[in-house]
Curated annotation (Swiss-Prot):
It comes from Danio rerio. Secreted scaffold protein that plays an essential role in dorsoventral patterning during early development. Stabilizes axial formation by restricting chordin (CHRD) activity on the dorsal side. Acts by facilitating the association between the tolloid proteases and their substrate chordin (CHRD), leading to enhance chordin (CHRD) degradation. SMART domains: OLF. Residues 132-383 form the Olfactomedin-like domain. Keywords: Coiled coil, Developmental protein, Disulfide bond, Glycoprotein, Secreted, Signal. Residues 1-18 form the signal peptide. This is Olfactomedin-like protein 3B. It is found in: Secreted. Its main location: secreted. The gene is olfml3b. It comes from the Eukaryota. Belongs to the OLFML3 family.
Length: 394
């Protein structure tokens, strides 16, 4: 009996303990559920607030984009109007420059004076001996942009006695490209269609010339060495060191070019620096000997390029940053250009500045390289005044 009572007491005690633990567990779970419900309610509240802020931000962004779109349209309209006004001003400037050109800087071989007394002293026989070619530029007739190929600086030119085009990409390399025609160059993707020509020594600057099947270039060496390269036989035909002490650029705005080799109707020439001015040398295209030298008195400052037509040097000037290029200094080795007929030519505004200008006497065109663009300028020529009216005999 006692055992039964003891067993019942133990059973009741165990049941009471289990009830206590169960109640504690339920209380814990209930508290955790309440905490989770509070967190969920807080998350919902924050989510609603974030959604509200996002909608407000989207509305503000949409309003701002709409305002920016209106401002952009207005700015574009203003820029188009400004561009039209600038074009109109440039056309008016072209007209004014054509009608009232400022007096150019003209230099002649012997400091020519235009007085009648001096003119009468000149002999007619001497005049006809010197003037092998008697053309002078009167104006730019047309401009054509062929394509854009390669580096901002370079050179392209054509041998006057063939249809081949030669491209020098950059200012220092030993590789150039030959194209059989203008059409082949125009249709080529880059220089892919060109024939690659590798010369023994790297060329320097953009002062190269192609004349009668030969390439004449300044070698990139410690000396100012002219290399004559046979384009037919792919071999060096001759070399010569120019007797020039200065290694300054011949044109201030193109510091890579130390000497500019030029070919025209009368043969091969070299333009080189001498102090603050540009000097000219007539070269024998066969032996590379220097036959005669002149001080053109054309300043190197702000010069970007030059070209020669019929023994007359035309130096092209610009500004930094680039503006409109212009011929502002003319030098005639035949002493046949007067102040009144020396042209002051403005080139159309383009992309940057000329890194090279090469004249083709057969086509009467300039091959120009401007910020990677290959440009052709068609020239209008006329007879020099003294060719039309030679000085009288004594």
């Amino acid at each position: 009996m006692k055992a039964t009572i003891f067993f019942l007491l133990l059973t009741v005690l165990a049941h009471s303990r289990s009830q206590y633990h169960y109640q504690g567990l339920m209380n814990y779970l209930e508290n955790r559920m309440l905490a989770m419900e509070e967190r969920i309610a807080l998350w919902h509240e924050q989510n609603n607030r974030y959604n509200s802020d996002l909608k407000e931000f989207r509305q503000q962004a949409a309003d701002l984009l709409e305002k920016l779109s209106k401002d952009h349209s207005k700015l574009r309209s203003d820029l188009e109007g400004a561009g039209a006004r600038v074009d109109r001003v440039e056309r008016e400037m072209d007209y004014i420059e054509t009608k009232n050109p400022p007096k150019p800087c003209v230099k002649a071989a012997d400091k020519m004076v235009e007085q009648d007394a001096v003119i009468k002293e000149k002999k007619k026989e001497e005049f006809f001996e010197l003037s092998v070619c008697v053309n002078i530029i009167s104006s730019l007739k047309a401009m054509k942009i062929l394509k854009r190929l390669g580096s901002p600086k370079g050179l392209w030119t054509k041998d006057a006695r063939s249809a081949k085009i030669y491209v020098f990409n950059g200012t220092s390399d030993n590789t150039l490209y030959e194209f059989s025609s203008m059409r082949e160059l125009s249709s080529s993707s880059g220089v892919s269609k060109g024939k690659q020509i590798t010369v023994p020594t790297a060329w320097n600057g953009t002062g190269h010339a192609v004349y009668d099947g030969f390439l004449y270039y300044i070698s990139e060496s410690s000396e100012l060495q002219v290399v004559k390269y046979d384009l037919t036989n792919s071999s060096v035909a001759d070399t010569a060191v120019l007797p020039m002490e200065e290694r300054s650029p011949v044109y201030q705005l193109n510091p890579e070019t130390l000497v500019d080799l030029v070919a025209d109707e009368d043969g091969l020439w070299a333009l080189y620096p001498a102090g603050d001015t540009i000097n000219l040398a007539k070269m024998d295209s066969n032996s590379l000997d220097i036959e005669q030298m002149w001080d053109t008195a054309c300043p190197r400052s702000n010069a970007e390029a030059a070209f020669i037509v019929c023994g007359t040097v035309y130096v092209v000037y610009n500004t930094k940053p680039p503006s409109r290029s212009r011929v502002q200094c003319v030098f005639d080795v035949n002493d046949m250009v007067s102040n009144g007929e020396a042209p002051l030519i403005y080139f159309p505004r383009r992309y940057g500045a000329h890194s090279s200008l090469k004249y083709n006497p057969e086509e009467r065109q300039l091959y120009a390289w401007d910020d990677g663009y290959q440009i052709l300028y068609k020239l209008e020529l006329k007879k020099k005044l003294w060719a039309v009216m030679p000085p009288p005999e004594e």
